Each structure stands twice: as structure tokens, then as C-alpha cells.
Amino acid sequence: MIGTPLKKSATRVMLLGSGELGKEVVLEAQRLGVEVIAVDRYADAPAMQVAHRAHVVNMLDRVELGRIVARERPHLIVPEIEAIDTPYLLELEQEGYTVIPTARAANLTMNREGIRRLAAEELGLPTAAYRFAASIESFRAAVKDIGLPCVVKPIMSSSGKGQSVVKSMEEIDGAWTYAMEGGRGASDTVIVEEFIPFDYEITLLTVRHAGGTTFCPPIGHVQIKGDYHESWQPMAMTPAALAESQRQAKAVTDALGGSGIFGVELFIKGDRVWFSEVSPRPHDTGMVTMISQNLSEFELHVRAILGLPVPEVANLAPAASHVVLASEAAEEVTFSGLDAALSVPETKLRLFGKPDTRPGRRMGVALSFGADTDEARNRAEQAAHAVKIVTL
């Protein structure tokens, strides 16, 4: 049952994090008559521009967060980013609030140590060999133990911040410093991972809902410095690799529990599959599903968290996405080149409306169909590169 927005009967959803993914969640929730409250650390975030109400708070401050939760009394609390006091979500859940998918899932996936130990040590899923280090001395020992090349990540970060590949012993101290600068929260721990020479990596969007578990067609993607740059669907895989990917995705999402969509990242080499990471929310590489599927990842997430039916998910046609990035910092920008971008065949454009820019900030995405994924990728790249961001 869903009530009437802005009335006593309203079904209220509080979104913690109001970026471009959250904006799409807001729109899909509102299409089903849900009242949405958007929260983030800065004003005029994309989801705030379309929500019924918005609050600007430091979500790492449980006092501030608790104040707005008590004021709004949401039926569902939906984390959209990692920069949240996730231990406090556990307390809110104990008080009777519903956290999506669960407070435990949000807490575990915020921390690479928590989710890696769950996947590798509790569930026995194949992963890259890894070590954790909380000092420069233990970091050097971990790199020596894992071997070169290796991948270094803060245990708490997002969008590739603080991640690097160490190829020589001379790079160790710089990698440690970079990880410390890119980490989020008070933790000074990093994970050192074996470098896996994979053929490709995928996101397997996995939906837990009242009727069971549904998998979307696999999404191929390219990351640059640990951050999503382009994605496409479907990604061609062997039947054995797809089956193993689905097995691993179901195992980890079942362990996390709750309802909603999960972005499960996996490395693939031939028929072999390694678990990498999981996000208990819509995934940035999944933006391609806004055109590629009969139901986008945002529609699927909203249906699942509201307890509504989730039918079979179908890929409509080969499609791809490519990011539009800012190159410099500015408090206000304009966009040119839209005529050229939208003249690319079978292409759409999404500009996120972020209030300011910084180098490398994602400001939009181009979405394209093609006769195959190669053509779709080329079209999306052409359109994205046609967009010019002009600082004022």
C-alpha cells in the first residue's frame, strides 16, 4: 500500500546521498506516488532538485543525522553513498526504522575489510589474495608478501579515490600516502591485493525482492583510476562464467540480506571468476540500464524496496554509456556542444545538474544504442566528448 505524497498517509523514503544515482531513484519513487526526502552534505545536489524536501547535513555526524530522521520519521531509509555513519544505521534499525537493504549490509560494504572477510573467509568465494595494513611498516610487509604488481586501496573510499597499482618497490611510500589522502573516515587501514590479469570485469546487477533473486544481463565496464568511465550491456560471457558469476552474486547478496538492487563487481578470465566488491544500491556502471533494459536499475531498486513485483529483466538492444567529466574547478558552468552530442544516432544525454565542478567530476553521461556493443560504445564516447563544459 502506498499513500498520498505530502499527506498524513504518505509513504516516506529518506535518501541518504543525493547524487545522480539518487536523482533517478527519486524520480522512480515519485512515479509510484512515494514522498521522498533527499539528504546530502552540500546544497542543491542532483536528487535534492527533484525531491519533495531536502536537508543539508554531515551524514557522518550521527547527531545531525538523528535529528532529521526524528523530524521526518521515514518509512524507509535508503543509503545512496558510502559517506554515512553506518554504525548509527544499526542503531536506527534497532529503534524500528527500516534501512535498505539492511543496516548490516550498509555497514559491511562501507568497509572493504568487512566485505572481503565476509566473501572470502565466511562464504569461501574466490578473491584476489589480500592483506590489510594499518602502518607504513606493515604496508611494506604486505606488499612484499603479496608480490608485485599489486593493487592498493583504502578500506574506506569511493569512486577510485586513493587507489593505485604498485609496480615497483620505489612506488610503495607514494602509494601509502595516496591511499591515506584518498581514504574516507578515521581509518588508516589499506587493503593490498594481488593483481589479477583478468580478461574483463563486469557488474552483475542482482535484485533481491519478495519473489526471490533476479539477475540483470551482465554489464561490461572500464574503470580509470578506479572510477567508472564507460559501460555496456550485454557483456558477452561463456555460459560457465555467467553461471559462476550468478552463483557468487547470489551467495554474497543472500548473506547481506534485505531487499533492493546490488551492484556485484567481478573479474573474469576465461571461465574463472573472482569476486571483487559489492554495492548495496544502484551502481554507476548501471546507468546504461536507463536505455538498455525494460526496467532500469532504478526502477528495479524502487520496486524491490517497496515490496512490488519484479518481472524478468530483458536487454532491449546493445547499449553503452560514457561519462562526461569536468576538467577544472568552478562554482558554475555552462554546457556547449549539445547539438553535436545529440546528433549522434540513437543517443541520449543526461546532465546531472551538479552545482559546481572539480577536475574529474562526473557531470553527465551519454547513452547510446548500436547494432552491437562496439558501435554503441563508439557512439556514446563520441557524444560524451562532444559536450564541452565552460566555466563561468
From Swiss-Prot:
Gene Ontology cellular component annotations, sorted alphabetically: cytosol
UniProt catalytic activity: N(1)-(5-phospho-beta-D-ribosyl)glycinamide + formate + ATP = N(2)-formyl-N(1)-(5-phospho-beta-D-ribosyl)glycinamide + ADP + phosphate + H(+)
EC number, UniProt record: 6.3.1.21
Keywords of this entry: ATP-binding, Ligase, Magnesium, Metal-binding, Nucleotide-binding, Purine biosynthesis
InterPro entries: ATP-grasp, ATP-grasp_carboxylate-amine, ATP_grasp_subdomain_1, PreATP-grasp_dom_sf, PurT, PurT/PurK_preATP-grasp, PurT_C
ATP-grasp domain span: 117-306
PROSITE patterns (UniProt xref): ATP_GRASP
Binding site for Mg(2+): E265, E277
An example molecular function term from Gene Ontology annotations: magnesium ion binding
Highest taxon of source: Bacteria
This protein's pathway: Purine metabolism; IMP biosynthesis via de novo pathway; N(2)-formyl-N(1)-(5-phospho-D-ribosyl)glycinamide from N(1)-(5-phospho-D-ribosyl)glycinamide (formate route): step 1/1
Stretches assigned to coiled coil: none
HAMAP family reported for this sequence: PurT (MF_01643)
Quaternary structure, from the entry: Homodimer.
Family: Belongs to the PurK/PurT family.
Protein name in the entry: Formate-dependent phosphoribosylglycinamide formyltransferase
Lineage: Bacteria, Pseudomonadati, Thermodesulfobacteriota, Desulfuromonadia, Geobacterales
